[in-house]
Amino acid sequence: IITQWHEEIQKFAPNLTVNIYDGNERKVCSDAHITIAPYTLLTIKGAEVGAPTPLHYMTWDRVILDEGHEIRNKSSKLFKSVCRLRTNIKWIVTGTPVFNSMEDFVSLCTFLGIPKNFVQGRTKEIKDIYILRRTKDDLAKINERLRLPPCTFENVELDMFKEEKALYEFVFLEAQDIIKDAFKNTQSLNSKNMVILECLLRARQCMIWPQMYLNGVGVKNGTKPTKWEGRSNKMETLFRMIQEHPKEKSLIFCQFRGEMNYIQSQLDCPVFRIDGSVPKDERVRQINAFKSAAPGAVFIIQIKSGGQGLNLQDATRVYITAPAWNPATELQAIGRSHRTGQTQAVYVKKLVYKECPRFVSVEEEMMALQGHKSIVCSEVLNDDRVKTQIPVNRTTAKISILDIKNIFRA
């Protein structure tokens, strides 16, 4: 993202000097018009929470937080650190003002200096006074040249193959027993929550690519993982859809590295990849190589690591292998392709397993959670369009850790 900001500043404001801060104390005091710094350098110096960094000793004319939703946790070291930056003008740039709940929005307002007691019950006033919102449609109304080609989104609902269904039912029943045992024992609430989340993780992995679940069991038991010999309807559908468009570049957004490894091993085309382990310089090389690659190339991206801050307009096909917790995460991922500079229609397909006859699908339950978060965001922004940006199967009240427990009927 830092590289992208630097390139955009050079493009639109070439007369401004830019300093990319890398932790060197002398560089922070440069005479540059703009200093760009990663969030990580606001928190790494000093062992104690709240230790100042060289950035805190400067008085800035303006502080701008890109991807500002990163400070949504008020108890985090990052939130406390950015609030201590010295400036009279503060901006937050984000496409996700509400990530999980209304409290996220309150955190952003706190950074801006808006009292919490003023925020509650006054979201419309806050929006009118403090939020400048521009959607892609809004920009097109201002300047027709900024109108993007259409973006078509489809939830591809699939049935599990027989062998997948059998494994998922086993995982589901096992999760029931594990959760029931945890709540019978005198464990702490945090321990019980961890048990529930681990069961959910295993069920999600099982639905995406069963070998990930088997690998996790092997690691936990200290044994060699059982090899998955069955088929995967989700993976076979993904590969078939890619093969149907051999002259178009594709993005595949994944949740886990395990599925990325498998997908990469099965594709017979130029494949590029970004996950959480890929360093900055290699990311840039992967992006540039994908842009210069021949039609048919595929970019596999871990959605948490590359779902924001990338320009990949060369791709016209976007595949999401499983629902994310937050619909905004998926929207940001789609925005890597469907953004200014895109000249062709973009087609997005999200692969979701439907409920089994005897057991609910954790993926469909996550879709329900997406519906709730879309409603909260639309209420904060006073904009019903938010609800329709990503189609969801149904909406529900907020899902808590106990609701996740109830998914397993435990």
Language-model segments: residues:
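Inter-lobe coupling linker of SF2 helicases/translocases
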Residues: 36-37, 41, 77-87, 110-216, ...
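Signature of the SF2 helicase/ATPase Hel1-core->accessory helical subdomain module
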Residues: 55-121
